Swiss-Prot record:
Gene3D superfamilies: 2.20.25.10. This is UPF0434 protein Bpet2671. Belongs to the UPF0434 family. SUPFAM superfamilies: Trm112p-like. HAMAP family: UPF0434. The lineage of its organism: Bacteria, Pseudomonadati, Pseudomonadota, Betaproteobacteria, Burkholderiales. One of its GO terms (cellular component) is cytosol. Pfam families: Trm112p (PF03966). It comes from Bordetella petrii (strain ATCC BAA-461 / DSM 12804 / CCUG 43448).
Amino acid sequence: MESRLLDTLVCPVCKGRLDFDRARAELLCRADRLAYPVRDGIPVMLESEARQLDAAPADTA
């Protein structure tokens, strides 16, 4: 994911920072423990599409 885009995007729930998990193609909000999918290179920034992160910290690439 392009770093300029990543610097611009924020979590739609808390407006916090997102980290890109390249291996899973997801944008991670650690504050809300949500992972937003990136499909065909397009971030899907809908809370209804996000999955809940496990209690263990996720690795980012």
